């Protein structure tokens, strides 16, 4: 056990943690050169295409150190994107240390900071590594100072390495062995194993990734999931080298996978504790905090026959992604579907793409909203995650919107633009600290503004140099209203949105104009209106297509023409009372892009 080291790799997006993991695997001979490929741990096609890590992956390697001992290194590669910070906190719960990878050209960024503080809160040993040292723009000395200034950990002896060329990788491994403590735990105690992650395999059922804290787990053991109290037989267990390799036992301090023929998706929840059925532990291991979704959106299958398949797909996906929340919902415009909760917009996009790719579904998404706290006139407080659930105006005493605390790290030259952007998003500055050329800004910005397009706008105003980390702070009273879109005086529930009163007229007008472009012309006029309650704030009309009924009248009497026009008018009137308007799929997506251009 003294020779085991468990650690995670944490870093900002694109600072090279997946490439560093590749080098560690190669150096320790986890895979032969033939099997080696770039970003070997990003196993999902989506991860490779976008060049980001979405799921944390674990690997067990054996490293013969300079002191002659062979060490077992269990490491977990984590995502760097702010939407997947939950994956990071899960991975850190299973480790004793973390490698903080910082790009020697870019320096410290907001996500580096956020993940690093999470690690320090969990009492992990943080080992700084300066990566991309081979770049002409690399300034390791400046970045080392920055790490000390901003993060507050000693970085003078930080290893300089280049994951791409393989320079300095040996030193990184030596640092891991020397600086990260060995796991603590009692091999004789009853088994306690923390479930870090689970996923569904069509042949094996539920596969769980576990970290053994106390005791050991062998093939054929009878184990029990502590919160549900259900017992299972251990069929297979093993480690990842990144390939799945079977072993007969996982000892104290090790990280590996376990298959117990669990068919029920909820059988082994992430963050739960496994123990032996007969010789069981008395208390559950401290898991990790359950995250609350920040963004909600309705997902509906385009054809209603796919509803069952969609439900099963969500179940399997939520096993693999514990931060996904879903509940059934039905809409008059779109039929049956699910209301899903996500951690952010990137998370929402990724989930939608995974459902469409891995489970072959066609889905429509409604506009994302955040959760509002509504105080009703009868004194009751309710939480609203969808505009259609908002009670009538007469029953509402006040609406409170969620406020996010945004920490940004910004280069000096872009400060002006970013302050303008934050003010436009109704932000209030709470702090500003200069660290050399970087400025740490703290703003309180309504969550609804942050999740929509704040991140994209922040990146474009700062040419990609500013970085952001946000977290929910509190609910605060605000003047929010619900804008309904009416087509031929019928409300379309899927197009409603909750906005601040000051922006309502502008957002309503913009949406109405957008809908006008997207709804095809019919044989009669279509009125598109935006309304707050019964008060219309914007209107636009899609003009009718009409046949020229006078084409065959040459000269002749005017009363003949009047008769034909009158007849056409009556026909149109009858049509309008009977006709209904098909709203195309693009129109629902238009909401997502209102205010972006």
Curated annotation (Swiss-Prot):
Keyword Cell membrane: yes
Enzyme class: hydrolase
GO cellular component: plasma membrane
Protein's UniProt keywords contain GTP-binding: yes
Residues engaged in binding GTP: 14-19, 131-134
Enzyme Commission numbers on file: 3.6.5.n1
Protein name: Elongation factor 4
Organism: Haemophilus ducreyi (strain 35000HP / ATCC 700724)
Name of encoding gene: lepA
